[in-house]
């Protein structure tokens, strides 16, 4: 008898306890377990190790291989310290199942769906198995539509696809976390959606910092936890490879419930998708598989595909995924990032140079790309404006060496005009964020796509050539820039009168 897959893997019925196995071999996080003839568990079933004298060890494993001779090989989801040969193992009869639904918002979970934030148990009876098929082709929503973020540089130059996958590239300290939090905030306000954050194999300190910053910025509501906009799932660097390999699926399962049952638009963050591949490589070696190129697992593209194909738009709702991508040794041909790129619809590249200039979000307008930036999808007006913005910025980039050596005065009249407009565009691509209000003191701005296009058209047409470039820095729409220019002019006049 098998228990219902929507029952938590750790809750084992009395009947199920009869299907007991025993540990016969332990190699690090990998266990070999012998079961009675005819009682073999299925692949991906969760096994729970029983301690001596019925003490609970809280070690859950996942069946990966059926070895023959009534033995299975399983990978542990937590440390195997203290386990011994001969210990009893219970087959739960179902894959690892995790809590889903509104009660997960504002909480932090581990790979098994257990809360780790000391706020008590999760108030839900609804759970879902982490292993599921991707939606059938007939369920998919094939409409190509833009997912408006309210962030000017993203919406204009590298728009996100609803139900698409976006790669987020950036080093330390260039604003990845703030950009992630702003996206979480904006999807909640503009789309009535929720977010799920999957911390896969990254630093525990960063996970803690993110949680505290989310509380500070109101993304997680401390006074009323269910009013929060995000659920967090962590499987950090110190966890065994089994946990790091499966934590992405746990986060995705929670996101799928919001999409399929609540019919919401969901934002799924995975930080970092490379660590998912890395954990799979460790597990593969422990299971005795022959490695392929650069030591990666032979099943690399299958594992990546099984995760990525579940991230999609259906007729009920959408999951739009933003995945931080670490590129080992900056080698884009490495099998891990190369396999990831095959699934991405857009790339958002954060630039240290722009961050150093104080332009936030520090999204590089020339390096960031999107498959959605085509006239038949975004329309001629949007496409033309984006191309002209890129051409202006590219020309400015080409002229920077000449400016550095000879100065602005040596440029032609046309080039000087291009530089002036490019500098205004560069500053207008910055914008104040809601989640950064506590640091900047400036109220956050959500800028609609139509307003964004209108603003950049005004700069490119030369209408605003007379305004100072600082008027375009950290404003929302173009009307705010003209108002700021008037304020600057008035302040200048006042200071002149005082003199």
From Swiss-Prot:
Kindly give the HAMAP family that the UniProt entry links to this protein: ATP_synth_beta_bact
| PROSITE patterns with a match to the protein in the record | ATPASE_ALPHA_BETA
Gene symbol of the encoding locus: atpB
Role this protein plays: Produces ATP from ADP in the presence of a proton gradient across the membrane. The catalytic sites are hosted primarily by the beta subunits.
Binding-site residues, ATP: 170-177
GO molecular function ontology, one term from the record: ATP binding
Q: Name one GO biological process term.
A: proton motive force-driven mitochondrial ATP synthesis
Quaternary structure annotation from Swiss-Prot or TrEMBL: F-type ATPases have 2 components, CF(1) - the catalytic core - and CF(0) - the membrane proton channel. CF(1) has five subunits: alpha(3), beta(3), gamma(1), delta(1), epsilon(1). CF(0) has four main subunits: a(1), b(1), b'(1) and c(9-12).
Task: Please give the Pfam families that the UniProt record associates with this protein.
Answer: ATP-synt_ab, ATP-synt_ab_N, ATP-synt_VA_C
Q: Which domain of life is it from?
A: Eukaryota
Q: Which InterPro entries match?
A: AAA+_ATPase (IPR003593), ATP-synt_VA_C (IPR055190), ATP_synth_F1_bsu (IPR005722), ATPase_a/bsu_AS (IPR020003), ATPase_alpha/beta_chains (IPR050053), ATPase_F1/V1/A1_a/bsu_N (IPR004100), ATPase_F1/V1/A1_a/bsu_N_sf (IPR036121), ATPase_F1/V1/A1_a/bsu_nucl-bd (IPR000194)
Any one Gene Ontology cellular component term annotated for this protein = chloroplast thylakoid membrane
Keyword Translocase listed: yes
**What is this protein's name?**
ATP synthase subunit beta, chloroplastic
**Family affiliation:** Belongs to the ATPase alpha/beta chains family.
Entry keyword set = ATP synthesis, ATP-binding, CF(1), Chloroplast, Hydrogen ion transport, Ion transport, Membrane, Nucleotide-binding, Plastid, Thylakoid, Translocase, Transport
Catalytic activity reads: ATP + H2O + 4 H(+)(in) = ADP + phosphate + 5 H(+)(out)
The record's subcellular location field reads: Plastid, Chloroplast thylakoid membrane
- EC category name: translocase
Its Enzyme Commission number? 7.1.2.2
Question: Topology with regard to the membrane?
Answer: Peripheral membrane protein
Organism of derivation: Ipomoea purpurea (Common morning glory)
Asked if Plastid is a keyword of the record, the answer is yes
């Amino acid at each position: 008898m098998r228990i219902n897959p929507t029952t938590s893997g750790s809750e084992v019925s009395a009947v199920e306890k009869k299907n007991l196995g025993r540990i016969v071999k332990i190699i690090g996080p990998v266990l070999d377990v012998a079961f009675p003839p005819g009682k073999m568990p299925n692949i991906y079933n969760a096994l729970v190790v029983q301690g001596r004298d019925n003490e609970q060890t809280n070690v859950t494993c996942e069946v990966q291989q059926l070895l023959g001779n009534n033995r299975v090989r399983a990978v542990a989801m937590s440390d195997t310290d203290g386990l011994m040969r001969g210990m009893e193992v219970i087959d739960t009869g179902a894959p690892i199942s995790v809590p889903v639904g509104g009660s997960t918002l504002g909480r932090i979970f581990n790979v098994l769906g257990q809360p780790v934030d000391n706020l008590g148990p999760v108030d839900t009876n609804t759970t879902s198995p982490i292993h599921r098929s991707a939606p059938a082709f007939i369920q998919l929503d094939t409409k190509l539509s833009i997912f408006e973020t309210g962030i000017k540089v993203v919406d204009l130059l590298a728009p996100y696809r609803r139900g698409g996958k976006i790669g987020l590239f950036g080093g330390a300290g260039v604003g990845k976390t703030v950009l992630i939090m702003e996206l979480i905030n904006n999807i909640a306000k503009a789309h009535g959606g929720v977010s799920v954050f999957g911390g896969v194999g990254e630093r525990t300190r960063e996970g803690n910092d993110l949680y505290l910053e989310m509380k500070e910025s109101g993304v997680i509501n401390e006074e009323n936890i269910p009013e929060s906009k995000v659920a967090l799932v962590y499987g950090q660097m110190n966890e065994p490879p089994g946990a790091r390999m499966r934590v992405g699926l746990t986060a995705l399962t929670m996101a799928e419930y919001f999409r399929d049952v609540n019919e919401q638009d969901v934002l799924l963050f995975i930080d970092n998708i490379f660590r998912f591949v890395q954990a799979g490589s460790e597990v593969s070696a422990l299971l005795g598989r022959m490695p392929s190129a650069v030591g990666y697992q032979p099943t690399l593209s299958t594992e990546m595909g099984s995760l990525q194909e579940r991230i999609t738009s259906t007729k009920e709702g959408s999951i739009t995924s933003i995945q931080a991508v670490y590129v080992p040794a900056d080698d884009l041909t490495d099998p891990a990032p190369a396999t990831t790129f095959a699934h991405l619809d857009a790339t958002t590249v954060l630039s240290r140079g722009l961050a150093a200039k104080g332009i936030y979000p520090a999204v590089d307008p020339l390096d960031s790309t999107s498959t959605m930036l085509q006239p038949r999808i975004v329309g001629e007006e949007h496409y033309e404006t984006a191309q002209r913005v890129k051409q202006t910025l590219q020309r400015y980039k080409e002229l920077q060496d000449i400016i550095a050596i000879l100065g602005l005065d040596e440029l032609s009249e046309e080039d000087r005009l291009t530089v002036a407009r490019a500098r205004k565009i560069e500053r207008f691509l910055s914008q104040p964020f809601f989640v950064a209000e506590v640091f900047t003191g400036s109220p956050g701005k959500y800028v609609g796509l139509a307003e964004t296009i209108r603003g950049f058209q005004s700069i490119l047409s030369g209408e605003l050539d007379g305004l100072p470039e600082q008027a375009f820095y950290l404003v929302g729409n173009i009307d705010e820039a003209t108002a700021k220019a008037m304020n600057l002019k008035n302040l200048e006049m006042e200071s002149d009168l005082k003199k």
